[in-house]
Amino acid sequence: MARRKKEPASVHRSSIASAAQELFRQKGIASTSMDEIAQKSGYSKATLYVYFKDKEEIVSFLVLESMEKLYGHILQALDSDGTTKTRYDNICQSLLKYQQTFPFYFQLALREINIDFSHTDFLPEEQETFRVGEKINEKVKQFIQDGIAAGDLRKDIQLMPAIFSFWGMLSGLILTAENKKAYIAQEMKLSREEFLTYGFDTLYRSIASGHEKI
């Protein structure tokens, strides 16, 4: 324990959150206790509360971590040249890769986040999560505006409703492909990849101007 005291608080928080993540993934958040997190992480319960006041703060820490990872994936997808459709495909593939690599984080990124910071009763991680989410929205907004300017996307697109709709539809499509892959293979005679390609292209057509070849 003496060695741990010499380490920065961020190291302890990351270690505890990592252990909690494993338990959340195995048992679910609601069914995991702080006692179990303490045991899994190798900290006493008293020490655990030095770094996190409760389980919700650990969840908030992990949600922020998930949003930061998602932002990195989106940034990489959009930081490339190419047509609007190519960049859209990059977004879809980055989300798919994110879900496959970090399935638990993918689920956390879909959770409702706090947007009311007019009072003092909020966690620092919640405000930072909101900020990262807004950075993601700005990147996608710029992508849509670039597509409209290029004549590839419809001019009547309402930016924020479109962004939120696409987050919901793309994430839902990815989860459906994961959870219903046996049905998709048996009844549709499609592989998971073929189903997703069809779904991604269908969604793109809903915002395409009609001038771009898909």
Segments the model singles out, each with a brief description of its role:
Residues 1-27, 31-40, 57:
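Basic, helix-initiating cap at the start of DNA-binding domains
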Residues 9, 59, 63, 67, ...:
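Amphipathic, non-transmembrane alpha-helical scaffold segments
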Residues 12-21, 37, 62-66, 70, ...:
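Generic hydrophobic, amphipathic alpha-helix propensity
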Residues 20, 41-52:
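Short hydrophobic/aromatic patch on the recognition helix
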Residues 25, 49-53, 61, 65:
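Base-recognition residues in the alpha-helical recognition helix of bacterial helix-turn-helix
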Residues 65, 75-104, 159-166:
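Hydrophobic alpha-helical connector segments
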Residues 97, 138, 142-150, 164, ...:
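C-terminal peripheral helix-coil segments that are non-catalytic and often amphipathic
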Residues 100-139, 160-163, 189:
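Short secondary-structure transition hinges
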